[in-house]
Every structure is written in C-alpha cells, then in structure tokens.
C-alpha cells in the first residue's frame, strides 16, 4: 500500500490550527499534535468564559450598587425592592454606572427607594 502524503487539504487544516496557536509557549505553538490539543482546550475556555463574563460583570455591578446604597443608608436588597415598588426600571449596569460617576443622581434614586419602602 502506498504512503499517503499530506495533501493540500491536510496542509490547510494544519496551517489553520498552527495559526490559531500563534503565541503559545513551547511546543504548543510549533508542533501540530500538541498545538491542536491546546487550541481545542483554548476554544473550550473561550466558550465557557464568554458565559462566565456575564456573571462576573453582574457580580461587579451588584458590589458597586451595594457599596453606594450603604453610603445612602440602605442595603442592596432594600434599595432594589424600593426601586421596584417605585416603578423605576433601571438595570444594574446603569445603577452601577450612576453609583460610580453620578453619586447625586444615585442618592436621589436611593431617597426614592426609601420613600417607597416606608409606605
């Protein structure tokens, strides 16, 4: 049986993998088999972490809102409940931005939440 040489399709596939592995350390950027394993693992990490990033940002926003809420005499949960009772539909991303960049506006929202909690 004759030996099968790597044709254009195989070469193209291997070049594509090695291109994705560019910048990896050691053999992982140069040897096809090791590079292929690392590229597969990297793609799995990328898929997982695209979902994780959404959770991480939500945690960050909540931490920022909680810190600002406590400066205004409320806990995070009471602030959110008060805003919901007031009919304010501001998402966590916008609230966190207000907490960092416009503390006066955040304080007004906190006062509104306090007023609606006491009703």
From Swiss-Prot:
A Gene Ontology molecular function term of the record: structural constituent of ribosome
CDD domains to which the protein is assigned, alphabetical: Ribosomal_L20 (cd07026)
A GO cellular-component term linked to this record: ribonucleoprotein complex
Keyword annotations of the record: Ribonucleoprotein, Ribosomal protein, RNA-binding, rRNA-binding
Pfam families reported in the protein's UniProt record: Ribosomal_L20
UniProt record, GO biological process: ribosomal large subunit assembly; translation
PROSITE patterns: RIBOSOMAL_L20 (PS00937)
Function (record text): Binds directly to 23S ribosomal RNA and is necessary for the in vitro assembly process of the 50S ribosomal subunit. It is not involved in the protein synthesizing functions of that subunit.
Record-stated family: Belongs to the bacterial ribosomal protein bL20 family.
The protein's name in its UniProt record: Large ribosomal subunit protein bL20
Originating organism: Geobacillus thermodenitrificans (strain NG80-2)
Gene (UniProt): rplT
């Amino acid at each position: 049986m004759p030996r099968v040489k790597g044709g254009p399709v195989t070469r193209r596939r291997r070049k594509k993998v090695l291109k994705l592995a560019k910048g990896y350390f050691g053999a992982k950027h140069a040897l096809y088999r090791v590079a292929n394993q690392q590229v597969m693992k990297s793609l799995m990490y990328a898929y997982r972490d695209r979902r994780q990033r959404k959770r991480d940002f939500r945690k960050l926003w909540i931490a920022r809102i909680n810190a600002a809420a406590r400066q205004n005499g409320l806990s995070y949960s009471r602030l959110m409940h008060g805003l919901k009772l007031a009919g304010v539909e501001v998402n966590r991303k916008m609230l966190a931005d207000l907490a960092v960049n416009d503390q006066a506006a955040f304080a007004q929202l906190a006062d509104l939440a306090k007023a609606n909690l006491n009703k």
